[in-house]
Structure formats: structure tokens, C-alpha cells
């Protein structure tokens, strides 16, 4: 395939379209396929050749694809992105004209994926040249992908087999990748609503559902909806292909903090298996109620946690660590009326700086308000009075 002529290539394209062979047509327009490295196909002006073989709008679509291979060959991703935009626009015209059929869905997947990739590359080139701010091209790409999404979502054909709605989840996942990259998570909301109300939501491919749950789980985590986040991220982790160690590790980076906030600590074996030992000391610190160790562990791996976007989530573990430390005080003193001084001593032992009785009251008030401690503070007697039943409820019942 690497060195076929332009005429042979266009003949293959013609036959794929004529026979409604979506998979073959997708390969012929995808940058994952080796034909893009063929110098014979990298053309600056292929329009005339394409018009001789292909009907509109396919002539325009594949001419843009050949110009795109030419641009990529010259490492000009700004031009490649422009060409890819034309490809998607002309594809959309053809796709809408295919009434009551969805054979071209694989083609849409190929051109949509390349659009996102080239938008990202173009962004980087433009930012280096000082011509645009980060995310401008990705934002424009998202608008075009939304046009594709609308075409799929509005296909109200009766026959589900031939419905374009099968393309919705792939596009949503591409849009999620963009929105997370440009930090516009609020734009995910209408897409989540559309998928959750779709009668196909459980019938999409496992791979697409795993990607979807991964992003929706991450969004739930940022929204502090930890139970929902645990459900989605656990689904993604359990259904992710066992050979995809890298993807499973990526899911765990977000699932671990969520699980820890719900009181489920990971084993050292799990952390070793997925090369996530950065969490080991954090886990130990939270379990032991060791504030000093938690502070040190977060500081030690701060760069990694910030890069992953979980540092602020992990900081929420501080309140859980207070809870675990204060539970130890309760277990040690074996009484339901606990002197506030006992908590002050525990905090000073953990080298918490400038702590006084007012701060102890403030921490305890927070723990009571959040449901981590069942009880009340008796200011008159300077005591914490805890419930005789389950004074420290399991974290999973609280968050």
C-alpha cells in the first residue's frame, strides 16, 4: 500500500464508497493508516485528480485529505488542521445525505479523531509562534465535533441497526478529551444528559463505555460527588482490557483518592503492580491518623499530584486524617466525654503548628458538621460528648 499511485488510491476510495464499505473507506482517510506516508499521495493540489474519479462532496473531502498528508509531511500542523476541518465539513454533507443508513460511521470516527489530534498539534505550533492562546484550535474543533454529534443525535430512524445514534458516544468521548484539556468541564453536562437518556447507553462497545465512565467519573470527583465518582471509575477500571496496564494505571490515579475519601485504602501490592507508590505514604498517613506523615507525603510527591490534577482532592484527606487521629484518642480514653485538651495533645504530638484549643474546637465542629463524628461540643465543660452508638461512622456512609 505504501507506494501505490494517486489513481490506484482514488480507485480504492471510489470502490469503498460505491460498495458502502465504511471500514475500508475509514482506513483510506485515516492518519493511522500507512498510506499517509506515501510520498506519491502527498500533494499540494490534488483537486483535479479527485474530481475526475469522485462525486461531490467526496472529491473535496479526499482532496483535502491528500493536502493534509502533504502538510503533515512538511510538519505544518496549522495547515493540516485547516485541511482536516474541510474533510470533516465535506464528510458531514455526505453523511447527512445518507438517509436511513449508517455505514459511514467508521469514517466519521477516523476523521473526528484526526481533527482532535491536529487541533492539539496546531494549538502547540500557534502558541510557540505567539499567534494564539492555548486551546483556541481545540475549541474550534469541538464546535465541529458538536455538529457531527447533532447529526447523530437527531437521527430518529425507526430501525436501530441503521441509526446514526451509534456514533454519539464516540463523539462525546472526543469532546470530553477536549473539554478536559481546555478546562471547560461545564460543557460536559448536556452531553452526559444526552447519553444517560439514550436507549443505547448500555449497548455501545465496552471500550467506548470505559472511556465515557472514566471521564464522567473524573468530573464527578471534581464536583465532590465521590460515591458517583467511585461507581463510574470502578466500572472503568474493572472493564478496562487487562492488557491495558497504562490505561488501568491512569484510571487508578483518580479512583484511589476517591476510594480513600470513602475509607477504602489501597494495598501496597496494588500500588506496586501499577507503579503508583507515590500513594503509599499518603495511604499509611491517613490510616494511622498521622498528620505529620501526610504533610510530608503530599509535599514529597507534590509535582506528580499536581500534574495529575489531584493535589487538591488529596488535601481533602486531611479531614479524614483528623477523624482517624481523634478516633484513636477516643479508643485510648474509652469514654464518651472527651476532654478537648486530649485532642490538643494529640495534635501537638503530630507537630501541627500554632495549634490551640480554639483550633481544636474548629476542627471538631467541622468533623461533626460533615458527619464524621456523632456528638457535640460542650463549651462549658470543654469536652467533646460523643454518641454511645457508632460515634465515628464509616466514611462510606458519610461522603
Curated annotation (Swiss-Prot):
Phosphoserine carried by residues: 45
Gene Ontology terms for molecular function: double-stranded DNA binding; RNA binding
GO terms of biological process kind: negative regulation of gene expression, epigenetic; negative regulation of lymphoid progenitor cell differentiation; poly(A)+ mRNA export from nucleus; positive regulation of B cell differentiation; post-transcriptional tethering of RNA polymerase II gene DNA at nuclear periphery; protein transport; spleen development; transcription elongation by RNA polymerase II
Modified residues (N-acetylalanine): 2
Annotated localization: Cytoplasm; Nucleus, Nuclear pore complex
Keyword list, A-Z: Acetylation, Cytoplasm, mRNA transport, Nuclear pore complex, Nucleus, Phosphoprotein, Protein transport, Translocation, Transport
Primary localization class, coarse: cytoplasm
PROSITE patterns in UniProt: PCI
Pfam families tied to this protein: PCI (PF01399)
GO CC, one annotated term: nuclear pore nuclear basket
Domain called PCI: residue spans: 210-391
Subunit composition and interactions: Component of the nuclear pore complex (NPC)-associated TREX-2 complex (transcription and export complex 2), composed of at least GANP, 2 copies of ENY2, PCID2, SEM1/DSS1, and either centrin CETN2 or centrin CETN3. The TREX-2 complex also associates with ALYREF/ALY and with the nucleoporin NUP153. Interacts with BRCA2. Interacts with SRCAP chromatin remodeling complex component ZNHIT1; the interaction results in inhibition of SRCAP complex activity, preventing the deposition of histone variant H2AZ1/H2A.Z to lymphoid fate regulator genes and restricting lymphoid lineage commitment.
Homology family: Belongs to the CSN12 family.
Protein's job: Required for B-cell survival through the regulation of the expression of cell-cycle checkpoint MAD2L1 protein during B cell differentiation. As a component of the TREX-2 complex, involved in the export of mRNAs to the cytoplasm through the nuclear pores. Binds and stabilizes BRCA2 and is thus involved in the control of R-loop-associated DNA damage and transcription-associated genomic instability. Blocks the activity of the SRCAP chromatin remodeling complex by interacting with SRCAP complex member ZNHIT1 and inhibiting its interaction with the complex.
Protein name: PCI domain-containing protein 2
Amino acid at each position: 500500500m505504501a507506494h501505490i499511485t494517486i489513481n490506484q488510491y482514488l480507485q480504492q476510495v471510489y470502490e469503498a464508497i460505491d460498495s458502502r464499505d465504511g471500514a475500508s473507506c475509514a482506513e483510506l482517510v485515516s492518519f493511522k493508516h500507512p498510506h499517509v506516508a506515501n510520498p506519491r499521495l502527498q500533494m499540494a493540489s490534488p483537486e483535479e485528480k479527485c474530481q475526475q474519479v469522485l462525486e461531490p462532496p467526496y472529491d473535496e473531502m479526499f482532496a483535502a485529505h491528500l493536502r493534509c498528508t502533504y502538510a503533515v509531511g512538511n510538519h505544518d500542523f496549522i495547515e493540516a488542521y485547516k485541511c482536516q476541518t474541510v474533510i470533516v465539513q465535506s464528510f458531514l454533507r455526505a453523511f447527512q445525505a445518507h438517509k436511513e443508513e449508517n455505514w459511514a460511521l467508521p469514517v466519521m470516527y477516523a476523521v473526528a479523531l484526526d481533527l482532535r489530534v491536529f487541533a492539539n498539534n496546531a494549538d502547540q505550533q500557534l502558541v510557540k509562534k505567539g499567534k494564539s492562546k492555548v486551546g483556541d484550535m481545540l475549541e474550534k474543533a469541538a464546535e465541529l465535533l458538536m455538529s457531527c454529534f447533532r447529526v447523530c443525535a437527531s437521527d430518529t430512524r425507526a430501525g436501530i441497526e441503521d441509526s446514526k445514534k451509534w456514533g454519539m458516544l464516540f463523539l462525546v468521548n472526543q469532546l470530553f478529551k477536549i473539554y478536559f484539556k481546555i478546562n471547560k468541564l461545564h460543557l460536559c453536562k448536556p452531553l452526559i444528559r444526552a447519553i444517560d437518556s439514550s436507549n443505547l447507553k448500555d449497548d455501545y462497545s465496552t471500550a467506548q463505555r470505559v472511556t465515557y465512565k472514566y471521564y464522567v467519573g473524573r468530573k464527578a470527583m471534581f464536583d465532590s460527588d465521590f460515591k458517583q465518582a467511585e461507581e463510574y471509575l470502578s466500572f472503568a477500571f474493572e472493564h478496562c482490557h487487562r492488557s491495558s496496564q497504562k490505561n488501568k494505571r491512569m484510571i487508578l490515579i483518580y479512583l484511589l483518592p476517591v476510594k480513600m475519601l470513602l475509607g477504602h485504602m489501597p494495598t501496597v501490592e496494588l500500588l506496586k503492580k501499577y507503579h503508583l507508590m507515590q500513594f503509599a505514604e499518603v495511604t499509611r498517613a491517613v490510616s494511622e491518623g498521622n498528620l505529620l506523615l501526610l504533610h510530608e507525603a503530599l509535599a514529597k510527591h507534590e509535582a506528580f499530584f499536581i500534574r495529575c490534577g489531584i493535589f487538591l482532592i488529596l488535601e481533602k484527606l486531611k479531614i479524614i486524617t483528623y477523624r482517624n487521629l481523634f478516633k484513636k484518642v477516643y479508643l485510648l480514653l474509652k469514654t464518651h466525654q472527651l476532654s478537648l485538651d486530649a485532642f490538643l495533645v494529640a495534635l501537638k504530638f503530630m507537630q501541627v503548628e500554632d495549634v490551640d484549643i480554639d483550633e481544636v474546637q474548629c476542627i471538631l465542629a467541622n468533623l461533626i458538621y460533615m458527619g464524621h463524628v456523632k456528638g457535640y461540643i460542650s463549651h462549658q465543660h470543654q469536652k467533646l460528648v460523643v454518641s454511645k452508638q457508632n460515634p465515628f461512622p464509616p466514611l462510606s456512609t458519610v461522603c
